[in-house]
Amino acid sequence: AGGKGWLFEDAFATVEQLDGYVPRLPFLLAHTGVEHSSDAVHRPLRERWLEGDREVRRGYEEISRLAREGKRALLGGDWERLGRLMNANHAVQRDLGGSGEANEHLIRLALENGALGAKLAGAGDGGTIIALTLEPEALEEVLMAGGCERVLYPSPVEGVCLEDEDPEAAPSSPA
């Protein structure tokens, strides 16, 4: 099941919860309807990384830099800057071979219809895009008319967490 939970345990990942600092999230997720295996995207990139491929290493260094700048833009509510950073992130991922035709179609539609930024979400090569928009309902209408299967609006949630057992509710012992 989900690799995102694994990120919290990865020694090389930096995961920060920002939901308490950002009053609203002007994003929408648009699903292309394309099913795929993330392994088909990640495996070749991982192999290239391990072989020391300069293009892949430079690409991921750039993605890391863009993420740090994006965090600052997000926390500052600078949506135009965040949109430009999302577009730059997508260009790097696309150039590394991570995007697919369905992703590109929805991203193009989003950007042509008022989105400040749009990029693939997840592994790429189909699946889902995320768009930064100040007019989500209008963009949803355009994306659905353009072949999008489903639109979702992300919102901060607590997510999965571990809780201490209730000391009052001790497990029963076998008879």
Q: Which ranges hold each PLM region?
A:
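Glycine-rich active-site/cofactor-binding loop and its immediate structural neighborhood
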Residues: G126
